[in-house]
A protein has these predicted regions:
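Amphipathic alpha-helical dimerization/coiled-coil segments
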Residues: 83-134
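Short beta->alpha connector loops
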Residues: 28, 150-154, 207
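HKD-type phospholipase D/PLD-like phosphodiesterase module
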Residues: 177-211
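Amphipathic alpha-helical interface segments
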Residues: 219-264
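Residue-level signal for tight coil/turn positions that link beta-strands
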Residues: 63, 216-217
Length: 264
């Protein structure tokens, strides 16, 4: 009698060793020793799982080198985006599930996996009055700083001035209300900044549904409104290179419907 095979969903997802082996082989065949080192597994523990993958025609092996079959590659091609998306949400479903994501255009929403493993920053009431120190610190180590914001922070005048003096190029997309605040309460500072080649200010034509999204050469900050549209002091920080590309594309998306501000 031919033994009954497991459903493919169980084969792939019911064992972390099998799932990680498939993902590891996604970019090409690997020697068993490399697989063992990468997965921090013993041969005795891993081989039975590899045999199951072979029995289900997902993996093939020869001379201690293993790779995906055509079926295996097809499935892992679909698996990788899902696993990447799960990694983003896995530890922070409460945050992502209670905050507004409508500001993200569809083509970038489908690529949320590119944010990678972010971390949630929970602030005390005292800390909530400060800008995120990680992004401020790393901006001074960056060539440029990109900000999309719909609210005015009282530290903006001093911090933006310091950044420009350190030759950091600033690109800021904001709302008419924020520009009005700059003009009414901080005219001299922002008039001086606008005369600098390093300070680039844009006003967006519509409501953006964003509290703050900012990135430099090192990290991406997402300070989102709640699902009810309220301001929240807690936020996410992402550090993967892919998250910076994602953040840059989001900035370019909003820049398309923004006009440069050359004078207050």
């Amino acid at each position: 009698m031919i033994p009954m095979k497991k459903p493919l969903l169980d084969v792939i997802f019911a064992s972390e060793k099998r799932m990680n082996t498939l993902l590891l082989l996604h970019d090409g065949p690997k020697e068993m020793e490399y697989i063992l080192r990468s997965l921090k597994a013993t041969r005795q523990a891993l081989l039975p799982q590899v045999r199951i993958l072979e029995d289900h025609r997902l993996v093939t092996g020869s001379n201690d080198v293993y790779g995906l079959t055509h079926i295996g590659k097809l499935l892992v091609d679909k698996m990788s985006p899902l696993m990447g998306t799960l990694e983003v949400f896995n530890d922070y479903t409460d945050y992502w599930g209670t905050h507004n994501l409508d500001f993200i255009p569809p083509h970038l929403f489908e690529r949320l996996r590119e944010l990678g493993k972010c971390k949630e920053v929970n602030l005390t009431l005292t800390e909530s009055y400060q800008l995120n120190q990680e992004i401020v610190r790393t901006t001074f180590m960056s060539e440029a700083f990109y900000v999309i914001t719909s609210f005015f922070h009282p530290d903006y005048p001093a911090v933006f001035t310091d950044m420009v003096q350190k030759d950091v190029k600033l690109y800021i997309i904001t709302t008419k209300n924020v520009v009005d605040t700059m003009r009414t309460y901080h005219y001299e500072v922002f008039d001086r900044l606008l005369n600098s080649k390093s300070f680039n200010l844009f006003v967006h034509s519509k409501e953006m549904g964003i509290q703050v999204v900012a990135h430099n050469d090192h990290c991406l900050l997402l300070r989102l409104l709640t699902s009810e549209g309220h301001i929240d002091i807690n936020h996410m920080l992402c550090f993967s290179p892919e998250s910076l590309v994602w953040g840059k594309e989001l900035f370019q998306h909003y820049l398309k419907n923004s006009q440069p501000v050359t004078e207050l």
